[in-house]
Design a protein with these regions (language model features):
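Membrane/wall-proximal cationic-aromatic binding patches
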Residues: 21-82, 92-98
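Hydrophobic beta-strand scaffold residues
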Residues: 83, 215, 249-250
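Catalytic His-Asp segment of secreted/periplasmic serine-dependent ester chemistry enzymes
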Residues: 230-263
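Membrane-embedded segments
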Residues: 61, 65-145
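Hydrophobic membrane-insertion alpha-helices, especially the h-region
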Residues: 6-27
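Secreted/periplasmic serine-hydrolase-like ester/acetyl group-modifying domain
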Residues: 125-214
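Second-shell loop/turn segments in exported
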Residues: 60, 85-89, 187-194, 224-228, ...
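Structural motif
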Residues: 57-58, 111, 216
Length: 263
């Protein structure tokens, strides 16, 4: 056997052993239930993992704008749609995509809403790679759980049973009125969307298309995070996203109602 083949074989064996070790440790440290006491991150958003199979019509993704603006129980009461908000504070698009994939493991929503503030939250390649590594091997996301392992962690079985009564919505009691006198003043300005963010939205759109769901981009009112420049860029991006690949809908509820839904 040549030196090259020996070296290649050693590398393959090393990688195989490493993958087995990472898989085993990941099974040990990953939370066995979707509760904060079991160590899961963002338990309100991860409450969707405990919902009965195929009971969610509408999935909502985004940062704090999403879980503050959308009230799933109100959507159920007024329109009869079952919705769940997987929004988290300062959510990045790679985290939005991770929740999208987790939700579709047991659910088949026909509509996915992406709150658009998340499109402008920048992130590093390092954090993106760490998230993808954590999706593959949970030890990268839950490496600190070794300090709080319980007896049931050693059984390696995962059983998500926790559900959230508010379905991901988080009531904010400390909100104060904002000065909206110059909010959404008409402008032809455009705000740049980072290239990697565009790529993630395109991936989210492609996943929705492949799984029979429509993607709806929605801009919730925010005098701090939203303006006409971002609206204009998002509208142009949504138009391009839908060309030749089905309908990409964009609704900006910061605009007057007769202009808010642009299809």
């Amino acid at each position: 056997m040549s030196r090259f083949l020996k070296h290649t074989l050693r590398c393959v064996v090393f990688l195989a052993v490493l993958a087995l070790l990472l898989t085993g440790v990941s099974q040990l440290v990953r939370p066995k239930n979707n509760t904060s006491s079991d160590g899961i991150h963002d338990p309100a958003a991860n409450g969707i993992l405990g919902e009965p199979d195929n009971t969610i019509d509408l999935l909502i993704l985004g940062d704090s704008e999403s879980y503050s603006a959308f009230i799933p129980m109100q959507l159920w009461q007024q329109y009869g749609y079952t919705a769940y908000c997987c929004g988290t504070s300062r959510q990045t698009l790679y985290y939005s995509e991770a929740f999208l994939h987790k939700a579709f493991q047991k659910q088949s929503p026909k509509l996915v809403i992406l709150e658009t503030d998340v499109i402008y939250i920048d992130f590093s390649y390092g954090s993106m790679l760490l998230q993808e590594a954590g999706d593959l091997f949970p030890v990268f996301s839950y490496h600190d759980r070794w300090k709080s392992l319980k007896a049931n962690d050693w059984r390696m079985t995962v059983n998500y049973t926790h559900t959230e009564n508010a379905k991901g919505y988080q009531l904010r009691c400390n909100a104060a009125p904002a000065d909206a006198s110059n909010y959404m003043t008409p402008s032809d300005a455009y705000a740049p969307i980072p290239k990697r963010n565009r790529a993630y939205v395109e991936r989210i759109k492609a996943f929705c298309d492949e799984n029979g769901a429509q993607l709806l981009l929605v801009s919730a009112p925010s005098t701090l995070n939203w303006n006409m420049a971002r609206h204009n860029s998002t509208q142009a991006f949504a138009d391009a996203l839908g060309e030749g690949r089905g309908i990409a809908r964009y609704g900006d509820i910061t605009l007057p109602m007769d202009e808010a839904l642009i299809l």
